[in-house]
Amino acid sequence: VSRELALHGVEHAVVDGRAAPGDVWRDRWDTLRLFTPAHLSSLPGMPFPAPRRYLPRGSEFGGYLDEYAERFNVPLHPHTHVRGLKRTATGAGFTAETDEGAWLARRVVVATGFATHPRIPTIGQDLDPSIAQLHSSAYHRPTDLPEGPVLVVGCGTSGVQLGVELARSGRDVTVAGKPTPRVPRVVSDHAFGLLLAIFHHVFTRATPIGRGSVRDVIRGGGGPLIGISPEDLMAAGAARGARLAGTRDGQPDLEDGRVLTVSSVLWATGFRHDFTWIQDLPVDEDGLPRHTRGMSEDWAGLSFMGLPFQFALSSMTIYGVGRDAAYVAAALARSTGASAR
């Protein structure tokens, strides 16, 4: 968005609570890899510096974001955590309360992403206190967990990746959750670009099939397994388990009737959204801002990036973010009277 605003000649500032743009990726587990190859993991104006089919590590993509911000002179203000956002008394602008004081702006782009708060099922409260619990967002490597058997809860791409890593490190691992559809490896290797193109051009809010899919996508949770499969779990020596139903005597109780004795539980259960930090923001029945392609339908001057199905199924991918950023920036530029590009 910053690059697009600069192309339009719109003066702006970018505030971030972290030290550098790529820190959000460097804070994930050490072996994390993107599921999109390098040529589909690039932002507009700067290709990812790797062979086309290379799957970048999370830390490598973090470095790429740092270089991107430097190349395009992003006016970044790091270590500036926004605690709250509200409209001014006149409704003609916004006040952002930060650790460095208040910021005033006529227009704001909320680019915090869709779901940023770890989702941990309430079942976790019933586990024996001796069982260590960790969400995937706080996990970096197998040594973060105490010795002994591990239950990974969640069978999405993250859960399977983590289950494989832990099993290969010598842990006794069970990965529990409902079966997740997967993209066959032949598609991952040879036709993933075509699949993303369909997500980008066919499943959009401008097509009947796209509009009919919006609610299912928003409410349906995670996507299919890409670049990894349940077979990889078995090959690594991990066990598959049914969904976590509850606890029995403080131990995890699975829907298939098994009660596991574990020393730790790793929650690979995703993230939830929370827009309550934006004071009095109107939201829809799913708790999301009402918007048209990221532009608030309720508050003039407020826009968003990274919402689920913001315009297309690709909107939550690196591949799709450029088009959404261009649209939002162009709309903001028109509202300021700027036209340089």
Each predicted region: which residue ranges?
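A short acidic, helix-capping loop that chelates divalent metal ions and anchors anionic groups
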Residues: P47-R53
